[in-house]
């Protein structure tokens, strides 16, 4: 007799539990009610997450890369054509063939390091043969003829 009685109490407990749960669901007193976020845009923007600082166990590159464009690499050679000589005499300008990757600022710095002269401005152009030509205009306190003589152009 006792096993039948136990089954009845289990059933009534289960039924009571189900009724309790149904009542809780209907009334809406659940703990984890998810709130719907209203989307105002069609596109989804990924939220910014935590980014930790890199702390590598060992360096991935063993040696630091050397500077491939130093002043000796930038200035290849001075031009000694008739038109370049005319520029030296008339416009206080030196003419150089320079590396194709060098920009005006790098050319200016290279001329300053190599020949200890101040430049007023630098004009560049790419020649049809693919090399870069630089017209380096010197400041009035330097004479291009003297500098050209010191370099060995004249």
From Swiss-Prot:
The keyword Magnesium does not apply. One of its GO terms (cellular component) is ribonucleoprotein complex. PROSITE patterns: RIBOSOMAL_L23. Disulfide bonds: none annotated. The keyword Lyase does not apply. InterPro entries: Nucleotide-bd_a/b_plait_sf, Ribosomal_uL23, Ribosomal_uL23-like, Ribosomal_uL23/eL15/eS24_sf, Ribosomal_uL23_CS, Ribosomal_uL23_N. Pfam families: Ribosomal_L23, Ribosomal_L23eN. Belongs to the universal ribosomal protein uL23 family. This is Large ribosomal subunit protein uL23. It comes from Daucus carota (Wild carrot). The lineage of its organism: Eukaryota, Viridiplantae, Streptophyta, Embryophyta, Tracheophyta. The gene is RPL23A.
């Amino acid at each position: 007799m006792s096993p039948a009685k136990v089954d009845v109490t289990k059933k009534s407990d289960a039924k009571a539990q189900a009724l309790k749960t149904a009542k809780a669901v209907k009334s809406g007193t659940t703990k984890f009610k998810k709130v719907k976020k209203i989307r105002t845009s069609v596109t989804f923007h990924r939220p910014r997450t935590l980014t930790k600082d890199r702390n590598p166990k060992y360096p991935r590159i063993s040696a630091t890369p050397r500077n491939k464009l130093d002043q000796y690499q930038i200035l290849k050679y001075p031009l000694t054509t008739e038109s370049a000589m005319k520029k030296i005499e008339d416009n206080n300008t030196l003419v150089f063939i320079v590396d194709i990757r060098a920009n005006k600022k790098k050319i200016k710095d290279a001329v300053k390091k190599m020949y200890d002269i101040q430049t007023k401005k630098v004009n560049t152009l790419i020649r049809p043969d693919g090399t870069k030509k630089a017209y380096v205009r010197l400041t009035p306190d330097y004479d291009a003829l003297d500098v050209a003589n010191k370099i060995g152009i004249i």
